[in-house]
C-alpha cells in the first residue's frame, strides 16, 4: 500500500 493512499484515507477521516 502506497503512503499516498494512507494520506488520502486520513484526510477523509
From Swiss-Prot:
It comes from the Eukaryota. It is found in: Secreted. Coiled coil: none annotated. GO terms for cellular component: extracellular region. Expressed by the skin glands. GO terms for biological process: innate immune response; killing of cells of another organism. The modification Leucine amide is found at residue 13. The keyword Secreted applies. Keywords: Amidation, Amphibian defense peptide, Cytolysis, Hemolysis, Immunity, Innate immunity, Secreted. Has no antibacterial activity. Has hemolytic activity. Belongs to the frog skin active peptide (FSAP) family. Temporin subfamily. This is Temporin-1Te.
Amino acid at each position: 500500500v502506497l503512503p499516498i493512499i494512507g494520506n488520502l484515507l486520513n484526510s477523509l477521516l
